Structure formats: structure tokens, C-alpha cells
Amino acid sequence: MAAVQKETGAGLIELLLGEHGCILALLRSMEQRLPAMGLAELKGCGAALEVVLQAHAVEEDQLLFASLDHAPPALEKALEAMYGEHEEMRRLLDKLHTARESGRARSLLRRLVELVREHFAVEERLLFGLVRERTSEDRLRELGRRYARRRGVETG
């Protein structure tokens, strides 16, 4: 009789949570330096944050949210809010790119940091739990493997 092999590897939610931790550390570092930053540095931080947030949002949108076919109304509402926040982050970043004074850029970056924190908190407190209720561990591991391949990392 063939032995049943248990699937290994991190699930998508665990990988996204790890990314949350890294992004939050980056935000804390930016926040500490925020008062002393000039316009060029503020825009540079915005550009770096844009790359990280865009990559993160793509994985959430294409792997996590897209895997939730026929979601119940409560989950649909949460997903719409998440998509809306992704759009708001993009708008803030666009405004930051065109800011001409450091005070305005600082205010935009500060608001972006707050929005990212709020967004992650809702995902962690509500959305990820709803996803776990509706998605098997095997499916989450498969999505985790797809995420890892797309990012060029090994999950085990």
C-alpha cells in the first residue's frame, strides 16, 4: 500500500502575513525619519513603498481574492472594501509623485502609512479568517506555492 504523503509548504495566508510583517517594519522605519525628510526623500520613500505595496496587492487580488468564487454577501462586502483601499493607496501614491512641497508630501505619506496599517488590520482580523473558513488547507498551500513561484522563493 502506498504511503499517503502530507502536503507541505506554507499557505498563502501565512506568506501574506509574513509580508505584512516586513512592510510594517518598513513603515515604522519611514515614520521615524518622516519629520526630518525633505521632498526628494519623501518621494523616494513613496516610490519604494509603491513597489512593495503594488506587488503585495497583485498577489492578494490575483491569488487570494480571485480564489473566492461565489462569496457570501459579508465576504463580498469585505472584498469590495479591500479593493477600494488598494485604489485609495494608488491615489495617494499618485498625489505623492506630483507633490511640490515637503509638507504636502509628508502629509500624504503619513496618510498612506495609516491606511496600510488599517488595511492590514482588517485583513488579519476579518478577511483572512473568512478565507480560512471557505478554503481548504490544501487549496491555501497550492496558492502559497503559486505565490512562491511568482516571487521566486522556496516554501518547503
Where are the predicted features?
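Small-residue-biased structural context
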Residues: M1-G156
